[in-house]
Each structure stands twice: as C-alpha cells, then as structure tokens.
Amino acid sequence: CEVAYSAAKAAVIGLTRALAKELGPSGITVNCVSPGVISTEMNAHLDQEALAALAEETPLGAIGTPEDVAEAIWYLSSDAARFVTGQVLAPNGGLVI
C-alpha cells in the first residue's frame, strides 16, 4: 500500500532527525538511507515495460541495485561519515531532485 509505505518512510526520516539532535551531544551519529527504485523483490511484480519506464524517469537512466544501497550504508557506517548526522542519503539515480 503506497499510503502506508510513504507514511512509514516519512516517520523514519523524522525519527532520524530527532534522534540525531538528541544523541549528537553524546557523539552518536544517526542517519538513514532512503533508496529510490531498487531491483528487489519489492518490485518483482512489475513487468519489464514498467521497470523500463521507471528507469527512463531516472536522470541516470537505470534502476538501482541492492549493492548501490549497501554502498550508501557502508559509507554512513564508516569513519568517512563521522561528521554526518541527521541526514537522509538517497541512492535514487536522481529520481527525486
């Protein structure tokens, strides 16, 4: 259901920002990853035509992979992101610009 999914995603973003403010003074960073269209079971019901249309809407012209999301998570959990908190990293190929 699109409504439930969208509401839950918005809640996670709000929780991320609130926790970042609350836990920042303790040196704890809180971020979230908000992927776009990714080639997973969630989209398995879509036919090739629908997937091609989604890819075409994306400025990079492709559907993301689970590896794209994993790389975003890796970055946020690495020392490279030690000064990043309260952010939403969106590996979405530019779909949401």
Please provide the spans of the model-predicted regions:
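Conserved catalytic loop/helix region of short-chain dehydrogenase/reductase
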Residues: 1-4, 27
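Active-site helix of classical SDR
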Residues: 8, 16
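A short C-terminal helix-loop "cap" of Rossmann-like NAD(P)-dependent dehydrogenase/epimerase domains
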Residues: 44-58
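C-terminal helical subdomain
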Residues: 32, 55-80, 84, 91-93
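Rossmann-like NAD(H)/NADP(H) cofactor-binding core
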Residues: 26, 31, 87
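Short, flexible catalytic-loop segment of classical short-chain dehydrogenase/reductase
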Residues: 13, 30-45
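Short, conserved catalytic or interaction motifs in soluble domains
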Residues: 25, 35, 78
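Alpha-helical segment proximal to the catalytic Tyr-Lys
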Residues: 21-25, 82
